[in-house]
């Protein structure tokens, strides 16, 4: 058909027809066709209206067009027919219409596609069905790729069409041009239904398609699990590979299809088939990171050592991927860990490069070799250390054998060790420790010495610092001071070595020298050759020289590598010319005076003695060697000639201040030039005229010149000789020759030689400095003084002082100050000793800047960096220091002075920094001086002290800055002065702060000092260290001085950087307390500051009173309320119970162990305790107490109840609840501690026969701790309630619970009793006595108020008041007196035990401060134990012991010497709680026990105390235990008046005693007992445990001890334990009085105490003590 013609004939009408067809406007089409007959008109692309209508699916139009005769088989330019268009678009009806009208069903378009192909491609199921039914060919193919309809249908997922085609005969295994079958196409996209139809129709599963892919491979690649499963059911060849050699398993493994991999493995796939690159399935899985697949493959025994591409194994790939889990799995199969890649890397090397610590560890565990090397020769160690990985290096070196690899070089010659050394921060030292810690190690500032050395170097190189200065580097022997010396030396050199190299300059000297050179050349040539030639050559040389000088001059000032040679020549020329100039100046010029350093700071240089060459320190020869090394250093620095010629040409003082040295009023250099001129002229004349007899004139001139020169030489023969001598003989030679002549010179002559040499050296340094405008400082380092012979130390110090006290010397002592001071003390002559000058004063006088090395302090300082407030005084704008502070920080002086400023500073920076420091230092010293001198405490300051203080302030300031701690200079100055003048007392303050938590920063030191002052020894006999402190009154004035008042914050800020305070002082103080702890078993805590809660016993909670400043130390410090005691016996080994006066304002929770355990308190005690809680709302007290009584909240309830339930029950307001809760928790804590520590107590505790077992529980624990050895019996097992109820008619007193804590009993009362101790006691001042007296009066008054129902306010402690001093005890009479007085106190005679206890307690009277005296509502001043106003502590309620007002303090009796000795020996812990079996049968024993008991008493102060405290009921003869319980319950000791009358010598009214009969022993009482009471020992704090029951008897401890010990076990009438003659005692508790009965009828026990110390004639003393008061503690002495 002629298509072209038809197209050209297209008309507008045809276009209209097309538009109507497009719009599907049938009517318009009809109208148009009616009008125009042309049906088959064509569009531009050859389409007919029928094709368009078929494509659009407009059936009616199609029908209309066919009816009008349209040709159904026409095609367009693309050979598309109407049928193809309709089939493609899926218009079934149109297809049917066309087929009915004979459309050609197999018509192909230009691509060879039939209508069926299009229907299959497009998924037109209905169309395909119609076509197939009408006979379409299902196996037709396209022209280009020969793709069958079924392939299109399968590949595109048209499952129904696939099924249709298969049903109509389509080939199931047909393939396209590349051999890809329908099954492969269907599997490729995972069309499951298509695959199923194909498989059901017998599709071949192993046919390969494009790229050799089978259906299985493409299905696996697509991850179509279901398809794969179906394919595998057809048993395909699972090992077929694609074109890259990948099997289905390889592909699945790489892609991570775990389930498919498992299916394939189950189907028997080979696991070790490699791909084309050689990688196996396992490697593929590993590279993909698929752990489960790897495990599956390993389970199927995949080969793990096959090498893939680049020789990498699966293990290597796992390492490279960093997958530790996979590595672990592979390693379990024992792979070869040493296979290498093409780069010779093993898995271990790769793991190390990747820094995979876990993988490295796994490989090493599997035995991988650390010695493997890569192609560069690097081992894993090289790599780890180069990568700075400490952990890796540590792992690699864990086998010591591999340490050798540190020194194995790689191909470049690097060893791991050298690589490490080349880095600033070594990692090998972190692994092995500082194997090569050396002073020069810049990276190893492990000792914190960098800051010290930098700060010191900064000060010593400060231009304004005026030598001589002596620095003391103090540290314990062996602490590495020598390291610091080397560091210090290096630092000083870097601080000083910052001068710029001088460059060549033209000067008169250069001109003169060049002329001389040329002249001499001319002379030589003139003599030898022709004079004219000589002149020409010399002038040429001169010209060349100056050209050379000019080039060097300008070239050295040019930048750039090419001019380096000029700079080198310029500096060398300058150096040599400068040296020549120096030599000439030495000969002809007087040295100029150095300018004032404040106007112009000259650079500083240091010369050091080589202290390492000293074989031994001490002795003249070593000093000579030291000076010799210094002279060697001078020669190295100043030059060989200058130093030796100085001896000849040194300036004499007679020269005056003129510039030139003169000879006969003519400057020497003029004479020299004249002679030199004569010489040169003569030579010139000789050269020109020769020696010619004809030339008279010349000859005359020559003769005259020769005579001038000759005369000059003759006159200076002596000088020439001196020059020759000094040049040949160095200073070192002279010193050695002097040392060799020691036997002739003697010591004095030798010292004179040394002195001359040192002065010459100093003068030389000063002279050369004048010429060179430098400051030279000669540093003499003396190391090892602490290891030389003691007798040489003083001599060495004197020598240093004599030799180096003038001139530019800096002496540095590195030594252990304690050893040195000890050596000085041994060797000081008697005159100095008599004038109270000791080694410490001597060293202080010599050393201007002490530095105690304390690296711990510095490290802690780092925690207080910049954020730290400026010591709370930032707002204090008054004064220069604020301004200076601000300036310093703003100028970042802190940064610039960071002491590391080494040579990296360029010249300008250095200069600026120096200027800044200089101005700061100047301002600081000026203002500090003004500040310090205006202060009162500085009135007696000497210039030397001032200098020392300023030096220390300067160093400390630098260290603070280095740690970025902000501070104020005036506070720092005050602190330094405090530590300088009173180091010992300051150490006490610091120790207190270190050991006590929660002290607010604002607390001023005065407050703290008041708390601990009484703990500090007052006499040097007791504490030799007191010698190092200044006047104590000045110290107190200083602490309260107006500006600035130092506070706790200041200590915390300054302490880490304080260099002048010996840290060992605190150790000594602590050690002393610890020692005393062992001796005394009981301690006293420091008083807590009112502002904080007391803490439970601190570390030192039990100190032996023997050593501690207070007689007994239950803790590091007194209880919050305890006013510290005088310390006279601080080191004397005496111990005494602590005096119990309490300060009122103590924290609600009292630190220290309570005397009474919480669980043993009754409701009344609880009520009393609540009242005593600091800060509780007093208006609501009545409501709270009512609640407590109503709910029956007693101690046992509080110790076990739920706190939340308690809160609901108490219904307190928030604040009160917090205070109450804290108090309860504290008491619980203390009880737990006590019970824990004293678990053994129950066994040892005295079990009172009839006391219910429950009693024992609570108290026992306490009791036990106190007496260890002998006091098994002291443990009281009575519960508090039982004790309190025994025979009490009134509510128990809870006042001083503290005394109860037998646990804290200080065992060494005995020592108090020693003669020595009593002597010491006598040393107490009257003032203290007066304080005691007043305090005691107040105490009695308060007790009387407290004593609610008591007829007689007899505080058991009163009895204690009467402790007889050891002297008294020694005197039998005294003892008896003491006893009597005690008995007086109560009509009952207390078993001597009681008395003992009492006396012991009495011994502990503390001085009472005024604040102590203000006792709250009767919380008596007595601070029992540590608890503040004992009430806080469990108060032993039941007893009389209700001390008045807070349980008046008890006075304990001092033990006698024997007792003391025994006690000290026994110093048992109550814990031992040995059973009373130890009843002492004989007095000796008794006393021993006594001592021990006493010790335990220290807790309780006496047995009775012990007993009373805990299970104190005396075992009365009848039912001792019952009685005891009763007696204890009735802690109240009522003394019979008759007894009191009996007591001898007790004044009826002891000061403040209300009832003469009761007459508590007052400190002021005249009686010997009272004397005891008032004796200094009173000042000893009584131990916490006091026997409440104890009667005041003064009987000696021995009696008490024996009696009580006996009592513990003793049979009622048995006095077997007691050797003391005990008459039947009257201690009887009426049967009617049950332990629980409120009233106890105390029958007086009549006891005869036999005092061990009694003189043979003394009659035994009989004391009556209420049974209540009798305690078991010393029941060993039986109470009959």
From Swiss-Prot:
It is found in: Membrane; Late endosome membrane; Cytoplasm. Residues 530-533, 690-696 are extracellular. Residues 1362-1554, 1574-1643 are annotated as: Disordered. It holds the Pfam family SAM_KIDINS220. Residues 1574-1602, 1613-1625 have a biased composition (Low complexity). A motif (PDZ-binding) lies at residues 1675-1680. The chain crosses the membrane at residues 509-529, 534-554, 669-689, 697-717. It is a multi-pass membrane protein. GO terms for molecular function: PDZ domain binding; protein kinase regulator activity. SMART domains: ANK. Residues 1365-1380, 1471-1502 have a biased composition (Basic and acidic residues). Residues 1-508, 555-668, 718-1680 are cytoplasmic. Residues 1388-1397, 1505-1516, 1603-1612, 1631-1643 have a biased composition (Polar residues). GO terms for cellular component: late endosome; late endosome membrane. Residues 449-960 form the KAP NTPase domain. Disulfide bonds: none annotated. Keywords: ANK repeat, Cytoplasm, Endosome, Membrane, Neurogenesis, Repeat, Transmembrane, Transmembrane helix. ANK repeats lie at residues 45-74, 78-107, 111-140, 145-174, 178-207, 211-240, 244-273, 277-306, 310-339, 343-372, 376-405. One of its GO terms (biological process) is nerve growth factor signaling pathway. PANTHER family: KINASE D-INTERACTING SUBSTRATE OF 220 KDA (PTHR24116), KINASE D-INTERACTING SUBSTRATE OF 220 KDA B (PTHR24116:SF2). Downstream target for both neurotrophin and ephrin receptors. May play a role in nerve growth factor (NGF)-induced recruitment of rapgef2 to late endosomes and neurite outgrowth. This is Kinase D-interacting substrate of 220 kDa B. It comes from Danio rerio.
